[in-house]
Amino acid sequence: VTPVSSAVAAIDQRVYFVEKPEKKKLLVSLLREEDKSVLVFSRTKHGADNISRLLSKSGIRSEAIHGNKSQNHRQRVLTDFKSGKIRVMVATDIAARGIDIRELEIVINYDLPDVPETYVHRIGRTGRAGHSGTALTFCTPDERPLMKDIQRLTGKKLNAETYRA
């Protein structure tokens, strides 16, 4: 068993094939169904801010962390997220490095990472220390080659759902 496949074995992984304009609706819909803390990954700083604004306007308490935010801001957001003061933390990959959140049940890949190994690091934020976890990934038509690379790396075919608003 490779370290990659063992790391992802305890995580329920699902992919949503979705058109780019529908991603926002899908995210809000999924977050309204769940009452748990969720870490959402965005590929860009700008995207993280946009997602956080969208969620806040939709009545879902969220904050974004990324490299343009101060260390104090990132620390406050992390503290608020861990305490449940905010339910959704939107992060870029670099900002999320080294973050340890116990019992995080759900990770959402709003954007697929450019590098398959980054996917493994992202979903590894959930399902830690014997807990189960869920990783939901949004995949637009232009991201399908990235999804194939991820499945090749993990050796796992993800449960797929097609989202239509």
Annotate each PLM feature.
Residues 1-165:
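Conserved helicase RecA-like core
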